[in-house]
Amino acid sequence: MLAGSNPKSATLVKRKDGSYYIQICVEKKPPKQQDTDKVIGVDLGRTDIAHTSEGDNWNGQQLSRVRDHYSRLRGVLQRKASKGTRSSRRRCRELLQRLSGKERRFQVWVNHRISKAIVSRAKTTNSAIALEDLTGIRKRVNQQPRSKAERRRANSWAFYQLRQFLEYKARVAGVSLILVPPAYTSQTCHRCLHIHPEQGKSYRSGKKFKCGHCGWEGDADLNGANVIALLGAVVNQPRGSGLFCSLAEQSRLRATESPLRTA
């Protein structure tokens, strides 16, 4: 990282657990972004943290188990911290601080691994990266029917941090990163570009996607990643504008036909 760069400053930082690390600020000119007509779509979600149009995915089950473990420990320590002797309460508060640091570092480590793998694949295949604009992703996933535990898991995951890691790693690697609007990405069939004709209904059911128009059937997150890749092609390929027109027309038809069906 320091090779070929110009260090500007260094800061010694003390963690809550008493350990230290050093932050070094360097100045490095990023390489020119590679010209390409290939796009890798990345779908971020609650079941798979990330799923790409290349078929790579990072399942969230193991990560959910780790976060649930931290949550249970936190609950036990919080209960103990509210009663007992003064020294035991202080000890519990110290353990809670250490636990918080471990969970935060775990999330950072996972997001670094995911972002590094995605950018490396894009660099190797001379592709750009497309992902949804994450503004409001936490609100959107929480609108879906889930248990209290599932909502807590989504709220605890650093989606925005993952996007930041992807952005800076892509910039350093000379890989273009494209943000696309999230509307209908999970409901559109990547093969025929159709969405369910009835408002409020979708061809997606959990992890499965079955198109009622062309018959394509497969993993819903893979389908979403492919749609995101197609939307990302708007920037790099002339055919992209046609995709937007297709989705816009279907959206308009659903909006105009809905009152007739309910009349």
Model regions and ranges:
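Positively charged, helix-rich recognition surfaces that bind polyanionic ligands
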Residues: 2-6, 14-263
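A basic, amphipathic helix-loop patch mediating RNA/tRNA/ribosome contacts
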Residues: 10
